[in-house]
């Protein structure tokens, strides 16, 4: 089986799941899969994907895994007790050929948020690995190792980048589980203190790495249906996060409604309360400059705040961003596909996004055209109107 542990996922799934347990236990949601890479035929692999998902749903947390989670300062004991009883249920996920007949597949995850939130990352990893083990039966790991060594050499060659740290954010789009583990260990051994850790909880536990993550888009999207008023949903999401974590895990995701809406909502209170913000779409250099100006305008010293960059990064881009912002703020970089799926093959651009919560459409209004995803055009238009956001050229989020 591809997934052999329920910890083989990203940390932010557990940090969000704890909020769901404590504040939104009755919420119901729907997620949908999309492959953004054109011309990819996934239909022949449906049976394999289903078999792997069936194996995923048979897994439970072990005592060792639960003890590991319990030792995290921000994980509460009642949440670990809940996880001791938890397993993913196959009845909440369906995997079918798309009626479009173009090689696409429809993966729909629908049910209680508390019982479906852990599907996304392992299912994406399953789709990726099933696809590549069928299309690349003799993987060119030699090429992958050479590319990885070049990245390590590039980052470690210049003394002025000694404080530039990267983290592995590559679980969902990794080439394979085996390759992902090799990448993480190679980064640990090759970069030393320049390797900040990994978003993958299983490898963090197994190899004594630092697990990293706070919140994802789905959390703030769900707040569109869970909060008191749509316009205040982002503020509501940040307030509920602070209510749960009391200042811990203080990295705010900035692009669910675009940068302008984020800055309008991220007032002096949030600037002081949260440790920093994460960039995941749009121009990262412009975003960073705007964040620094925003902190200064809200009487916060930017040098005490963390800017996290995680959008389609590679090592040269990391180094450019580090050169621009070093000394002006604290910096963190999460690199995904470019680390865990760079063996010379075209990686799949696949996502699973929340599209409904409590029967109501929810959406992400990204700073990057094509990254939004909503199956209700009327709601998307209404959401843009409420937040005063024009539709980016080339963005058809319902496709």
From Swiss-Prot:
Give the matching Pfam families.
NAPRTase, NAPRTase_N
What pathway does the annotation place this protein in? Cofactor biosynthesis; NAD(+) biosynthesis; nicotinate D-ribonucleotide from nicotinate: step 1/1
Q: Which GO terms describe its cellular component?
A: cytosol
Q: Which GO terms describe its molecular function?
A: nicotinate phosphoribosyltransferase activity
Might you give the EC number(s) for this enzyme?
6.3.4.21
Q: Which UniProt keywords apply?
A: Ligase, Phosphoprotein, Pyridine nucleotide biosynthesis
Q: Does the keyword DNA-binding apply?
A: no
Q: What class of enzyme is it?
A: ligase
PTM annotation, UniProt: Transiently phosphorylated on a His residue during the reaction cycle. Phosphorylation strongly increases the affinity for substrates and increases the rate of nicotinate D-ribonucleotide production. Dephosphorylation regenerates the low-affinity form of the enzyme, leading to product release.
> What's a BP term from Gene Ontology annotated to this protein?
NAD biosynthetic process via the salvage pathway
Keyword hit for Phosphoprotein: yes
Residues found modified as Phosphohistidine? 217
Reaction(s) the record says it catalyses: nicotinate + 5-phospho-alpha-D-ribose 1-diphosphate + ATP + H2O = nicotinate beta-D-ribonucleotide + ADP + phosphate + diphosphate
Q: What role does it play?
A: Catalyzes the synthesis of beta-nicotinate D-ribonucleotide from nicotinate and 5-phospho-D-ribose 1-phosphate at the expense of ATP.
Record-stated family = Belongs to the NAPRTase family.
Q: What is the protein named?
A: Nicotinate phosphoribosyltransferase
Organism, scientific name: Burkholderia vietnamiensis (strain G4 / LMG 22486) (Burkholderia cepacia (strain R1808))
The gene for this chain is pncB
